[in-house]
Amino acid sequence: MVPRLKSKYEKEIRPTLQKSLGFQSVMRVPKLEKIVINVGMGEAHTNPKAMEACLVEIGQITGQRPVKTFAKKSIAGFKVREGMVLGCKVTLRGHHMYEFLDRFINVALPRVRDFRGVNPKGFDGRGNYNLSVREQIIFPEIQFDKINTIYGINITFVTNTEVDKEAFELFQAFGMPYRTAGK
């Protein structure tokens, strides 16, 4: 079954963006390529149980098994050695990507405490959007009474466009609730 946001993109969003951005070819229209979910846990090397719980929770949130991330080099000030586990990440593409985006926009973001919209300044100058969530408990897949540690999640939305304005319009069409200037 095709995810709701994917069919909405193909039937409504893509033709609308093609007209509004003035593209001749449908292939020039901005498209979401992948979503990368990353968790960096400072206590991963001192508390292996917290890291294992993080792997399970990110797997529940995304529907895919996360990959552990390791330190590339030693940093004495942070007591980090090369090869230590520092966190985990998941790359979502295809159906999983659209299903995650749908759940994130319509279920998880409204559960954020004092939510006024996501920051529109999270674009990197290359058409990709980055945002951070302070708590993993905003996702409905996480059972609040079973978590030991609360940690933040970094989410990167990668698009095929190089222009931030085009990516902004794409995410707005998906329903991303951006913070307005007055708030």
Swiss-Prot record:
Known function: This is one of the proteins that bind and probably mediate the attachment of the 5S RNA into the large ribosomal subunit, where it forms part of the central protuberance. In the 70S ribosome it contacts protein S13 of the 30S subunit (bridge B1b), connecting the 2 subunits; this bridge is implicated in subunit movement. Contacts the P site tRNA; the 5S rRNA and some of its associated proteins might help stabilize positioning of ribosome-bound tRNAs.
GO molecular function terms listed in the Swiss-Prot or TrEMBL record: rRNA binding; structural constituent of ribosome; tRNA binding
HAMAP family the UniProt entry points to: Ribosomal_uL5_B
One GO term of the biological process aspect: translation
Species annotation: Leptospira biflexa serovar Patoc (strain Patoc 1 / ATCC 23582 / Paris)
Similarity section: Belongs to the universal ribosomal protein uL5 family.
Keywords on record: Ribonucleoprotein, Ribosomal protein, RNA-binding, rRNA-binding, tRNA-binding
Subunit annotation: Part of the 50S ribosomal subunit; part of the 5S rRNA/L5/L18/L25 subcomplex. Contacts the 5S rRNA and the P site tRNA. Forms a bridge to the 30S subunit in the 70S ribosome.
Identification of the protein by name: Large ribosomal subunit protein uL5
Pfam families (alphabetical): Ribosomal_L5 (PF00281), Ribosomal_L5_C (PF00673)
